[in-house]
Amino acid sequence: MELPILPTSIIGSYPKPRWLLRMYNLRELGRLPEEDFREAVRDASVAVLREHERAGIDIPWDGEMGRSEMTEYFTAKIAGFKFYGPIRVWGNAYFNKAAAVSKLEYREPLVLDEFRWVKENTTREIIKVPITGPYTIAEWSFNEYYSSKEELAFDLAKILNKEFKLLEKEGATFIQIDEPAMLNHPDEVSIAVEAINRAVKGVKVKFGLHVCYSNYYLLADYFDDIKVSQFALEAANRNFRDLDYLKKLTHQELGFGVVDVHNPRVESPEEVAKAIRKVMEYIEPERLYINPDCGLKLLDRRIAYQKLVNMVKGVEIVRRELAREGKTSIPFRREV
């Protein structure tokens, strides 16, 4: 499979339509049948896919329309987790933090139905499936059963490995593991690395790893130890400063974040193009994918869409420059 040079993608989440948020509220109040809720999620999924395609995104996803939160969605489907109620994260934001109260077991598919639906309803040949990684789920859960976080993370890796194999069997070609908590504790990074490697073992798809708002110099020390083909990292939020850690990314691909998901200001195409030219001082364009810094769900939907539109326009500016050098496409590589 071939892709245009500098393929564009999203990281995962996208703002939910207001009417879907109302469906979530009605469901929580017990006033919406589950069948109606699922239909609403699927309708929103198709609407978001069309937005991404209209913006020009090469590798889309449905913006996680069926996911209320990036860990709760998964822990609710894994046997051995229990919920005591919502906890406060910041401000007025809450989430249901799960507790591991018995040995974790694979009970049901985690994202298989999502993948099937997106695959059936996109016009794109390649889609990327985002899944929260084993260490982040362990870090963001209470541990009331296992002797250590390491043991908990490794059992989660086994469960994810089963899911990854199911996705491969269904035709998935690109899976992104989201590990925002991976670098929270520098003395535990090796645990996260081993958990990721156990999760991907024996699965022959392209794996990416997304880590955001962290010490990338610490991550860079492990670039060659993590068995993934691509690292999707944010850079716009830090104003593209201090990219020297990329010197250690010698052969893997980089998913480069060029729009800030925490700032409602819409970047211009020229700003995006300038950022891409800067990162090409470190990474050749054949190893570059372009994406937002992180998930877009906290933004107004209109702003999120315009950020994607301008991101693609900025990419097209650089593509025209690269075309003059005869660089127009790259192969879709599952392993690098």
Curated annotation (Swiss-Prot):
Family of the protein in this entry: Belongs to the archaeal MetE family.
Biological or metabolic pathway of the protein: Amino-acid biosynthesis; L-methionine biosynthesis via de novo pathway
The keyword Iron appears for this protein: no
Name used for this protein in its record: Methionine synthase
Entry's cofactor comment: Binds 1 zinc ion per subunit.
Keywords noted in UniProt: Amino-acid biosynthesis, Metal-binding, Methionine biosynthesis, Methyltransferase, Transferase, Zinc
Transmembrane is among the record's keywords: no
Signal peptide location: none
Binding site for Zn(2+): 210, 212, 234, 294
Cofactors, names only: Zn(2+)
Family annotation (InterPro entries): Met_Synth_C/arc (IPR002629), MetE_arc (IPR022921), UROD/MetE-like_sf (IPR038071)
Any GO BP annotation: methylation
GO molecular function, one term: 5-methyltetrahydropteroyltriglutamate-homocysteine S-methyltransferase activity
EC code: 2.1.1.-
Protein source organism: Thermococcus kodakarensis (strain ATCC BAA-918 / JCM 12380 / KOD1)
EC top class named in words: transferase
